[in-house]
UniProtKB/Swiss-Prot annotation:
Subunit structure: Part of the 30S ribosomal subunit. Forms a tight heterodimer with protein bS6.
A GO cellular-component term linked to this record: cytosolic small ribosomal subunit
Family: Belongs to the bacterial ribosomal protein bS18 family.
Protein name per UniProt: Small ribosomal subunit protein bS18
Single GO term (MF): small ribosomal subunit rRNA binding
A GO BP annotation: translation
Keyword Metal-binding recorded: no
Residues making up the signal peptide according to the UniProt record: none
InterPro entries in the cross-refs: Ribosomal_bS18, Ribosomal_bS18_CS, Ribosomal_bS18_sf
Length: 96
């Protein structure tokens, strides 16, 4: 007498029960807005060393836009302004 036993779904996949019972709301990171967009946003200028130095790391490298939340267009302008300021010796290429 062979009986076929159908296993319960929760016994086969314990992760399925965990997601159903202890389901949490997923964490949504707040979308950052570009610091150079908006009505009173600062203009990117190679002579504004204080503004440009905010977007440089401790080593003098340009910080990527995924960290600074700068839009792609403004990141290109920012990189160009930083490179221009470096060329004119307003900003250092590297920091020791």
């Amino acid at each position: 007498m062979s009986e076929t036993i159908t296993p319960d779904v929760h016994e086969v996949n314990p992760a399925a029960r965990r997601t159903a019972v202890g389901a949490r709301r997923p964490f949504y990171r707040r979308r950052k807005s570009c610091p150079f967009s908006g009505p009173n946003a600062p203009k990117i200028d190679y002579k504004d060393v204080r503004l440009l130095s905010r977007f440089l790391s401790e080593r003098g490298k340009i910080v990527p836009s995924r960290i600074t939340a700068v839009s792609a267009k403004k990141q290109r302008e920012l990189a160009q302004a930083i490179k221009r300021a470096r060329f004119l010796a307003l900003l250092p290429y590297v920091v020791n």
